[in-house]
Amino acid sequence: MNEAVKTLDGWFCLHDFRSIDWAAWRELNPGNQELMLNELSHFLSDMEITKNIGEGEHTIYSILGQKADLVFFTLRDSLEALNEVENRFNKLAIADYLLPTYSYISVVELSNYLASHMAGGEDPYQNKGVRARLYPALPPKKHICFYPMSKKRDGADNWYMLPMEERQKLIRDHGLIGRSYAGKVQQIIGGSIGFDDYEWGVTLFSDDALEFKRIVTEMRFDEASARYAEFGSFFIGNLLPSENLSKLFTI
């Protein structure tokens, strides 16, 4: 049997995409709308406390197009904690007007294609660089891009039949492209084999949305992607600070 990749795993991730039911929201009187927005604000304040004590992260982006209106991206140290956030959110009154359109579950990961190199032989979980990747601080960048992807298992283009050494080389070459965008694009890779319909969820952050187009285009021509990658839907959005939520919902 081919050697399986080993991973270092960090925070669990939920990308929760919602569409606003504007027709139903318009039927509410302003007083009820205000009560719901205040309840949402208290919920987000509690999320901020969790973030400040280093036990998780979260952010909200406004999504363009008809796939969704919002994405709530939450990271926690266990599936139980992530599920608790999800359930509490769904119990908010405003959740009745935020219709689920898509979700993705993953765990931030580093594979042994890269992790041993980064750790330099020490316990990787004690390495500051590795920990920063596994338990990332989400940057307040203007734009987000999320997409799921998998590796092919088609005939000669079967990623899982390649020897470990060849996979390592392809991933390192692929990673060189990503590193060339340092300072322009921040990337979080969530492993989702056994968790969701694809094998990874990729989240990109940037202050220039065109950098998403540039990095994805360049990577498409790299062999690891050109021969072996399959992609799901792409979601693009703009940062939505919590203090701007009331403005969004004002009609």
UniProtKB/Swiss-Prot annotation:
Which keywords belong to this entry?
Answer: Heme, Heme biosynthesis, Iron, Metal-binding, Oxidoreductase
Cofactor(s) for this UniProt protein = Fe-coproporphyrin III
Q: Which Pfam families match?
A: Chlor_dismutase (PF06778)
GO MF terms here are: heme binding; metal ion binding; oxidoreductase activity, acting on the CH-CH group of donors, oxygen as acceptor; peroxidase activity
Question: Pathway it acts in?
Answer: Porphyrin-containing compound metabolism; protoheme biosynthesis
Which catalytic reaction applies to this protein?
Answer: Fe-coproporphyrin III + 2 H2O2 + 2 H(+) = heme b + 2 CO2 + 4 H2O; Fe-coproporphyrin III + H2O2 + H(+) = harderoheme III + CO2 + 2 H2O; harderoheme III + H2O2 + H(+) = heme b + CO2 + 2 H2O
Q: Name one GO biological process term.
A: heme B biosynthetic process
**InterPro entries for the chain:** CHDC, ChdC/CLD, Dimeric_a/b-barrel
- Active-site residues, record numbering mapped to chain: Y147
Keyword Iron among record annotations: yes
Binding residue positions for Fe-coproporphyrin III: R133, Y147, P148, M149, S150, K151, H174, Q187, S225
Q: How is the cofactor bound?
A: Fe-coproporphyrin III acts both as a substrate and a redox cofactor.
Question: Is the keyword Oxidoreductase assigned to this protein?
Answer: yes
Question: What are the EC numbers?
Answer: 1.3.98.5
Judging by the UniProt lineage, the source's domain of life is Bacteria
What SUPFAM superfamilies does the database record attribute to this sequence?
Answer: Dimeric alpha+beta barrel
Which family is this protein grouped under? Belongs to the ChdC family. Type 1 subfamily.
Q: Which NCBIfam families match?
A: PRK12276.1
| Function as written in the Swiss-Prot or TrEMBL entry | Involved in coproporphyrin-dependent heme b biosynthesis. Catalyzes the decarboxylation of Fe-coproporphyrin III (coproheme) to heme b (protoheme IX), the last step of the pathway. The reaction occurs in a stepwise manner with a three-propionate intermediate.
- This protein is called Coproheme decarboxylase
